[in-house]
Amino acid sequence: MFPEPPTPGPPSPDTPPDSSRISHGPVPPWALATIVLVSGLLIFSCCFCLYRKSCRRRTGKKSQAQAQVHLQEVKGLGQSYIDKVQPEVEELEPAPSGPGQQVADKHELGRLQYSLDYDFQSGQLLVGILQAMGLAALDLGGSSDPYVRVYLLPDKRRRYETKVHRQTLNPHFGETFAFKVPYVELGGRVLVMAVYDFDRFSRNDAIGEVRVPMSSVDLGRPVQAWRELQAAPREEQEKLGDICFSLRYVPTAGKLTVIVLEAKNLKKMDVGGLSDPYVKVHLLQGGKKVRKKKTTIKKNTLNPYYNEAFSFEVPCDQVQKVQVELTVLDYDKLGKNEAIGRVAVGAAAGGAGLRHWADMLANPRRPIAQWHSLRPPDRVRLLPAP
């Protein structure tokens, strides 16, 4: 009833092949070679990575071992240097005990030779400063400029000073000073001979001193002795400060010029811990003030700088009869100006003031600058003019 389906015949050459019926033939040789090559590269890469990782582990262990070895070597090296620099106490050799070593240990400040004699007729104690040996070098050049300050405690106002000897550690002084003291009072006095290194532009440094209680000295006959210098104690009095000024004298014009340069480390006078300092300059003749000058006031400072010049007419025949007195005062607008300290220079000044004056006269027409330590106004005493 229904027509039969047509019987399929052979495919026509124009009919496209069916992809589902593609036959699986043998794999080509080039494909096999590619697969083998890629697989080999993968295996080689894996092996190489494992090898590198293993090498890194070994290198790390070796570095740690080397570091430990180097650390031990450094410790050993340090110990060897310690042994060389700081040997055992038992290996130290005893220091030589010759005369030179004793001098270095005991006389490192130096020695002073002096003489003592008492004149019963005049009631005077004669103190001779003879010489010093092996003084300590306080200057950069390995030397000192020594001088000796002499006074009888408890009175420090009456004191003498020798001349300065330049660049020497073994000065010969040969100077004698007289103290008028009743014999019955000598037992309670102490003679002080202090050696200083002179410095024109700063505070003089103490090298050492000798203290002789007069109660221990037999003055029935002249005494001459060597004593070792001892370290000088610090000044008991309060520091007032220092002032620097220059002196210049022109003999042909009879003109004396004082230049107040600066001051430093002044005593605090105001409530706020500062001062308002200025300087008064007096020219004295016969102990009387004949001329007066003063600097400007510097506000709120303990280290004022002035650089102010003042001139005085002083004939040549009067230059040895005058003195110059400089007083540093604290200005007070509401109250009285209070003196901080004072310095005197001149032929009758003595000590540093006399040296400064002598240097000025020895160098005419040249300004000679020098630092001076301020002293309490009531302790600045001028000796009678020559």
From Swiss-Prot:
Domain of life per record: Eukaryota
Ranges facing Cytoplasmic side: 46-386
The keyword Repeat is annotated on this UniProt entry: yes
Binding site for Ca(2+) 1: D139, D145, D197, F198, D199
Region Disordered: start-end pairs: 1-23
SMART domains assigned to the protein according to its UniProt record, in alphabetical order: C2
Vesicular side: 1-24
Native organism: Homo sapiens (Human)
Residues binding Ca(2+) 3, per UniProt: D199, S202, D205
Every C2 domain range: 108-227, 239-372
Protein name: Synaptotagmin-5
SUPFAM superfamilies: C2 domain (Calcium/lipid-binding domain, CaLB)
Cofactors, names only: Ca(2+)
Binding site for Ca(2+) 2: L138, D139, D197, D199, D205
Function noted in UniProt: May be involved in Ca(2+)-dependent exocytosis of secretory vesicles through Ca(2+) and phospholipid binding to the C2 domain or may serve as Ca(2+) sensors in the process of vesicular trafficking and exocytosis. Regulates the Ca(2+)-dependent secretion of norepinephrine in PC12 cells. Required for export from the endocytic recycling compartment to the cell surface.
